[in-house]
């Protein structure tokens, strides 16, 4: 019940993040935007079916909290169905949802063209056949830190789809390293690449909706960027792009971002790990190293991957690499296996990193931090739209210091809702729950 109680304590604050307001004047030409639909990954849901997949079937063992969320979900759907009945002057309207898995073109860390995958979802209603609804708002959802490709947006019915319980258009990119590109390294915390991937997913997802959906947005629609954990940094990076490209912000009716538990200043996050002597989730260490080596080979020229690790870690590195590359375990399962390989339930940085890399005055450390600093979202721009952040002060994976860096940099442009005692998993669950229950 802890997470559920947290939810209702802060719903009034979180609801401030959900306002929308401009006429649908976006008439961008989508005819030349490449996309390809994957029929095997495209789905249709009734409201009941979506509720079952999100929260568990009625009477299942999904837990008391999920049962309450399921009830709220269906109550709000019923209220919206009643509104549609009044609007249409009839009875018997039933809400439903449709989602398309699609492929689109973007770029990898080397600037090479890649085909990526994503999912777009929107609401519809049934009355003598199915009819697409005009979306109120467009949401871009950057997925959280995931270790199992089955949790990629295009592969599953994810919590973010709870946003579609009214008339929303939801676009969720898999990003590099997941979906069709699951064999690739996740360019973790490389915000330049993630922004390019997300913009291309947005263009292609919108084109999919224009072809298969209603093709018309409601008056006063806005684009809102969402993201949690790994996706929070991606979301704020996309926010920065819009705030430094006025034409794009206007084109997409950009409103604001609402993120949770992210690494917005990667060098601050990394230095906090050093201050702590470790992190709640040890796999983030090799994932970050692999990403920086792949993303900035010139800046890390002369250093091999092995240079970052101690002998103890190197002895099991091939096994850990296989776990990371497999992308077929939950993060808890993967974390437990890595700790087993390291022979400790409380691994420190000394169990992973070399003495040289642990030295903040070493060349390898300074070069690595410079790579992270290229992705610092707390400097180099001035926000024009509100940044809303949910964070835990006791998050052992995504340090609160990173949220503080954004608040300190941008002051009143940033609204932070903080929880004192909540781990990373719980704060992410709270974010999902809050958005699923507040936005209708």
Where are these regions (language model features)?
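Short beta-strand/loop motif that positions the catalytic acidic residue
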Residues: 383, 388-395
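Catalytic-loop region of hydrolases
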Residues: 27-126
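Accessory cap/linker subdomain of secreted extracellular hydrolases
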Residues: 37, 41, 260-380
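Alpha/beta-hydrolase active-site loop
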Residues: 188-212
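Short, surface-exposed "cap/lid" segments of acyl-processing enzymes
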Residues: 110-117, 121-165, 174, 181
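Primarily recognizes the serine-hydrolase "nucleophile elbow" in alpha/beta-hydrolase
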Residues: 204-280
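C-terminal motif of bacterial Sec signal peptides marking the signal peptidase cleavage site
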Residues: 17-20
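C-terminal catalytic histidine-bearing segment of alpha/beta-hydrolase fold enzymes
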Residues: 271, 364, 369-371, 397, ...
């Amino acid at each position: 019940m802890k997470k559920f109680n947290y939810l209702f304590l802060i719903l009034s604050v979180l609801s401030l993040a959900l306002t929308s307001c401009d006429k649908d004047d976006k008439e961008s030409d989508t005819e030349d935007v490449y996309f390809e639909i994957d029929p095997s990954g495209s789905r249709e849901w009734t409201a009941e079916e979506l509720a079952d997949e999100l929260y568990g079937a009625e009477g299942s063992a999904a837990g008391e909290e999920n049962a309450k969320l399921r009830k709220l979900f269906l109550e709000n759907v019923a209220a919206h169905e009643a509104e549609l009945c009044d609007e249409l002057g009839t009875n018997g309207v039933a809400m439903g949802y449709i989602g398309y898995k699609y492929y689109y073109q973007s770029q990898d860390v080397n600037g090479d063209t890649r085909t990526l995958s994503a999912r777009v979802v929107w609401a519809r209603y049934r009355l003598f056949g199915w009819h697409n609804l005009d979306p109120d708002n467009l949401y871009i959802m950057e997925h959280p830190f995931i270790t199992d490709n089955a949790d990629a947006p295009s592969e599953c019915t994810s919590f973010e789809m709870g946003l579609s319980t009214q008339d929303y258009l939801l676009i969720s990119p898999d990003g590099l390293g997941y979906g069709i590109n699951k064999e690739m390294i996740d360019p973790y915390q490389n915000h330049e690449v993630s922004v390019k991937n997300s913009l291309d997913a947005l263009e292609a997802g919108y084109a999919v909706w224009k072809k298969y959906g209603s093709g018309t947005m409601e008056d006063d629609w806005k684009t809102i960027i969402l993201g949690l954990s790994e996706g929070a940094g991606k979301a704020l990076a996309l926010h920065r792009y819009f705030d430094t490209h006025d034409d794009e912000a206007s084109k997409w009716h950009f409103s604001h971002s609402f993120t949770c538990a992210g690494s917005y200043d990667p060098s601050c996050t990394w230095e906090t790990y050093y201050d702590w002597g470790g992190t709640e989730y040890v796999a983030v260490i090799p994932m970050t190293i692999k990403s920086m080596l792949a993303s900035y080979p010139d800046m890390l020229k002369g250093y091999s991957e092995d240079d970052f690790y101690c002998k103890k870690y190197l002895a099991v590195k091939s096994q850990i690499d296989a776990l990371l590359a497999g992308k077929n375990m939950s993060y808890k399962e993967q974390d437990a296996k890595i700790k087993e390989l390291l022979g400790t339930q409380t691994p420190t940085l000394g169990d992973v990193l070399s003495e040289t890399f642990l030295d903040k005055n070493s060349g390898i450390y300074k070069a690595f931090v410079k790579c992270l600093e290229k992705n610092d979202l707390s400097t180099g721009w001035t926000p024009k739209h509100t940044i809303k952040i949910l964070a835990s002060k006791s998050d052992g994976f995504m340090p609160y210091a990173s949220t503080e860096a954004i608040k300190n940099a941008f002051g009143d442009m940033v609204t932070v809702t903080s929880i004192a005692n909540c781990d990373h998993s719980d704060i992410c669950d709270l974010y999902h729950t809050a958005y699923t229950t507040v936005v209708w």
